[in-house]
Amino acid sequence: MDDILSQDEVDALLKGMGGGDVETEGDDTSGGQSAKVYDFTNQERIVRGRLPALDIINERFARGFQRHFNEMIMASVEVTAGEVKIIKMIDYLRNLFVPTSLNIYRINPLNGVSLFTLDSKLIFTAVDIYFGGTGLLPFKIEGREYTPVEMSMVRSILDISSENMRKAWGPVMDIEIEYMHSEMNPKFAGIVDPTDMIVVSPINVRFEGVEGRVDIVMPYAMLEPVRD
């Protein structure tokens, strides 16, 4: 028996499908699982892969920061760029100690604001070495404010950070760093909504026997120019 339909049979079948007289595979929704609805505006679904251009920027920043930081504290310090992390703002803030030097900046012409985070270990060690110490004295990160001397060190570190950030971005685009304000308590330093995704670029600063860190924190949406 010939399994090929005649043209009249094909026409009748198409007419039945269009009018609903003939069931199609897509008509049967019983017994199957319902379709999942995806929110394509959810950043967690669209954040994928690495940011190779940002890795290069961070390497440039680390080299420049090392040179200037060595000159500033008159000691040998090794500075390296760590692995970039993409996480929620709330997850980043909840893991910070108090006090932490949290400094909010604009990076013009990029949209939004960014965060330069200096951990207290970096600040305390740099101050000790600057005044002739070894940087190896034990210290406790307490819930206290920074001293005037420690704040002066923070400002000096921020100055060289801003300059080297501008130079590191130079081959990609011209930027200007605009300081806005500083905080010590993480709950006052959210630069985006708590559940928004941020990009954390850790810069590791190794003294002899001690390690501190600078984090450059930017909203994921800010980095459109360097995603490709």
Language model region names:
Residues M1-D228:
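N-terminal auxiliary interaction/assembly segments of multi-subunit proteins
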